[in-house]
Amino acid sequence: MNKVPSLDYDKVVRAFQRDGFVVVRTRGSHIRLHKNTPEETIKLTIPMHKPIKRSTLSHILKQADMTLEELDKLL
């Protein structure tokens, strides 16, 4: 498995928006994204950090049920 890269928050948010996530709100230094699926609503919180730590991005990908390869295609 490849290492999760350290990316800026704006690139990550744009990638998730391409995947169908919608920005619901921005509060303080965090952005909240939602995506409705037939089974559930996936909710993500992205910190507005440049760059986002690799471990944080790894947890965000797990919450979104997305692989690193899928994220690379969306970037």
Residue ranges, per PLM feature:
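C-terminal structural segments of small proteins and small subunits
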Residues: 50-75
